[in-house]
Design a protein with these regions (language model features):
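N-terminal secretory signal peptides that target proteins for export/translocation
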Residues: 1-3
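Structured, helix-rich domain cores that form ligand/interaction pockets
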Residues: 5, 9-441, 450-515
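Residues in the recognition helix of alpha-helical DNA-binding motifs
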Residues: 447
């Protein structure tokens, strides 16, 4: 018995000795105190965020917009927009306004949509109004409006719709056109969630086919290979885009990074505690690189800045230096080290139901007496007031995921816990409590850093193409680049600056960016 306790004591003392000797090479992020852990890694589990992400609506007039119309008001309207189209052909967007719209930033361009919508009135990052001055049939809508994602998420759907309708009403009043009907054209219902942190397992085809109850006959999966023989299921779709309803499930975090737009989503997820401060750091830095494959490198960058173990910080810096100088690195080794030192990035999935007019026109909506005061736009208000009922229909009759163990008849099975949480998500159409300026400043700073990186790379490339391979200082390269420009280049630059400045929202860029 004494020998037994002696052996245990020996093992215990050896463990203490090894901890003292090698403990400094442990995962030091894991050894931080609870307060530090909460600061960097706290997030709410299994959280959902719902909103209408895309909203198209169409407007038709009582007036005759056919090619051989005799309506004088339509002829005046057509003449004015034909003049704008001829002027805009020099590739410079034009300021545009009508009485009552002086407080709105509006620009005209002759962008084409669907063949015959050849005029576009835009409010940067808010909406685009596509106008057909000639329609092929008398049942074709003369105007199609696209409401952008940013105001829909940050200001609310009704507020964004009413803001765009100010322009429609101003056009109607100024040109004496009578609005006949305003109706929905396409609406996307989206659920952002951090519920699934291993979507490639949960949504694996053999699991999905057992869980799904739907009218879809086909499904499309897209995978991407990852380091260390792992793979990533980043896109699933059911149906076709031209169908009444098209369903997508994909990695929203990856889309934001690779597409290089909508960086304000990162802020939105952070303020709703769907991602941690660590995730916020990684996504913000990764956005500037616009390359998803550098995810593990940014995780190492985080540790090199905030980790406490000098041995591992040096290893992190070595990998980053190797990538910066050689352009290549062993991503398998990088991935293993990142997994050892820091948590994996929180994945945000987007579950999206894209509905089109061919399906929504048959919906039996509850008509609200209070919406009669809105006149020709009553259909839109009724549709938005039926939002909960429509989303319940989409997430049950169009597609639902069920627990096959809950009933012998699959059609009677209860929802999976994941699907229950999705259907319980709150649907509140109000402006967000987080000041919009925070989102604007955050997005602008990320885009500024992205543009600066591109500018530096382009400036060096221009110098090498112009002067050949040289050892000049970078400052000299920049000076020489300016000397290469002629009058035509300066004129083209001024035209582009004018055009680009009109494409940006003036509220987002009214002041100099603060460092």
């Amino acid at each position: 018995m004494a020998k037994k306790y002696s052996s245990v004591l020996t093992i215990f003392l050896c463990a203490i000795f090894l901890t003292c000797v090698f403990g400094h090479r442990g995962i030091s992020m894991a050894s931080q105190n609870t307060e530090q852990k909460n600061n960097w890694f706290f997030r709410k589990e299994k959280k959902f965020l719902h909103n209408i992400d895309t909203f198209y609506y169409s407007v038709s007039f009582c007036n005759d917009f056919l090619k051989d119309t005799e309506d004088e008001n339509v002829k005046t309207f057509r003449k004015d927009f034909d003049k704008l189209a001829a002027t805009e052909s020099i590739d410079i967007n034009l300021d545009w306004s009508l009485p009552g719209l002086e407080d709105m930033q509006l620009i005209y361009s002759n962008r084409s949509f669907a063949g015959y919508y050849n005029n576009c009135i835009s409010c940067p990052e808010r909406f685009d109004i596509f106008i057909a001055t000639r329609t092929p049939t008398d049942i074709t809508s003369e105007i199609l409006v696209q409401l952008r994602s940013k105001p829909l998420w940050l200001q609310g759907v009704v507020s964004t719709f009413e803001y765009s309708m100010r322009v429609i009403n101003a056009i109607s009043k100024y040109y004496h056109l009578q609005i006949h009907e305003v109706k929905e054209n396409r609406i996307d219902y989206c659920w952002h969630t951090n519920y699934l942190q291993s979507p490639e397992k949960y949504l694996r085809i053999d699991n999905f086919v057992q869980m799904q109850v739907s009218r879809f006959k086909r499904i499309n999966y897209q995978y991407q290979f990852k380091p260390n023989n792992e793979y990533e299921n980043d896109y699933i779709s059911l149906g076709r885009r031209s169908d009444k309803c098209f369903v997508r499930m994909y990695l929203k975090t990856k889309e934001v990074i690779e597409q290089g737009y909508k960086p304000w989503f990162i802020n939105e997820w952070f303020y709703n505690q769907m991602i941690s401060r660590f995730d916020y750091y990684v996504l913000s830095n990764l956005y500037e690189l616009r390359n998803w494959k550098y995810l593990d490198i940014i995780r190492l960058q985080f540790y090199s800045e905030y980790g406490s173990d000098e041995f591992y910080r040096t290893k992190c810096n070595d990998y980053m230096h190797e990538l910066a100088t050689k352009g290549v690195v062993n991503f398998d080794s990088v991935n293993k080290l990142a997994d050892k030192l820091v948590p994996r990035l929180t994945v945000i999935m987007n579950i999206e139901f894209r509905t089109t007019r061919k399906g929504t026109k048959s919906y039996c909506l509850i008509e609200y007496e209070r919406n009669k005061k809105y006149g020709v736009t009553k259909r839109i208000y009724d549709y938005l007031d039926n939002r909960r009922m429509i989303s319940d229909y989409l997430t049950h009759d169009t597609l639902r995921l069920v627990d096959i163990n809950s009933d012998s008849n699959k059609s009677r099975c209860d929802y999976t816990n994941f699907w229950k949480s999705l259907r319980r998500t709150k649907q509140i159409d109000v402006a967000k409590c987080v000041p919009e300026k925070l989102h604007r400043d955050y997005s602008r700073k990320l885009d500024y850093n992205l543009m600066k990186r591109r500018y530096i790379h382009s400036a060096i490339s221009l110098s090498l193409y112009g002067k050949g391979i040289n050892n000049d200082e970078v400052e000299q390269d920049l000076i020489d680049n300016l000397a290469m420009l002629n009058d035509n280049d300066i004129h083209a630059a001024m035209n582009y600056k004018y055009k680009r400045s009109h494409q940006l929202n003036s509220e987002d860029f009214e002041n100099k960016l603060e460092d």
